[in-house]
Amino acid sequence: MALRAILSVLLLAHLSVTTPTPKHKKEKPAAFFLAGDSTTAVQSAGGGGWGNGFLATLQPPAYGVNKGHNGATTVSFVKGGDWATVLNLVKNATDAYNVFVTIQFGHNDQKPANNVSIAQFKTNLASLASDVQELGATPLLFTSLSRRNFNGAQLIQDLGDVVNATREVAAASHIKLIDLNAASRTYVQAIGSAEADKYNLVAGDRTHLNAHGSDVFGRIVADLILKSDKSLSRWIGRNATLSHLIAEGVYA
C-alpha cells in the first residue's frame, strides 16, 4: 500500500512537469490609427508626412488608418471632428485588434496665430492620450517630425518648445514616447541639406514629405516603434537595407 502511494505521488509529480500548459488565446493583430497634422497626413497639395510610409510596413491582418489633417493643432483636431473619428475607429477595432493611436502635434500649435500656449498644448496632449486609454487602446506620443532647414551645415532646431513639452507630458503621464524629432534630426543632419531637399513635397518645402520621403521617414517610425515594443515585430515588417542606410546616416 505504501509502495502504491509512493508511485501515485511520483506519477502526479511527473504529470505536473510534463503536462503542457494550455495555449493562450490567439494574439490579436495590431491596428494603428494616426492622429496628427500635415507631417503625418497623406501626401496632397497642402501637405504630406510619414504616415502612409509607416502604414505600408504593416503586415496583414494588421492595418492602419491615417487621419493626419493639414494645418491641425491639438485644438482644431478635436473641434473639427477628426478626434471623434479616430475614437470611433478605436471603438470599432478593440475587440479584434490590439489598437495603438499615434499622436503627433506641434508644428501648428507653436504658431502664434493659432493661440495655443505651451501649457494648453501639454494639457491637450494629456487629454488625447487619456481618451485613448479609456477605450482600452495604447497611445503613442510622438515628438514632431523635424523640419529640414539648415544654417550653413547645421540643422536648425525650430521645434524645441513643443518637442520638450511632448516629452514632459509622456514622462508625467507614463505614456510611451516615440522621439521622432530626435531620430529625424539625427538622420537629416547626417545626410545634409542638399540630400534632405530631395524629400521635399515641392521645391522649397522643407516641412512636408514627398512619397519617397514618406517611405524613408515611415521606416524611421517603424523602427522606433519596434524598438519600443519588440512584440510588434509580427505585425511591422522590416527592411534591413533601408534601416541600415538610415542608421549609418546615408541618403536612402
For each feature predicted by the language model, list its residue ranges:
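Extracellular/periplasmic catalytic domains that process cell-envelope and extracellular macromolecules
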Residues: K25-K28, L58-Q59, A93-Y97, E134, ...
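Serine-esterase "nucleophile elbow" of acetyl-processing enzymes
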Residues: T19-N70, A84-D95
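Fungal secretory targeting signals
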Residues: M1-P22
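Oxyanion-hole/transition-state-stabilizing segment in secreted/luminal serine hydrolases
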Residues: K79-T123, R147
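Structural recognition of the beta-strand scaffold that forms the well-ordered cores
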Residues: A31-G36, T40-A41, Y63-G68, N98-F105, ...
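Catalytic His-Asp segment of secreted/periplasmic serine-dependent ester chemistry enzymes
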Residues: L145-A252
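Alpha-helical scaffolding segments of alpha/beta enzyme cores, especially the outer helices
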Residues: Q120-S130, E134, D161-E168
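Extracytoplasmic/secreted cell-surface and envelope-processing proteins
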Residues: V42-A45, T74-F77, D109-N114, I118, ...
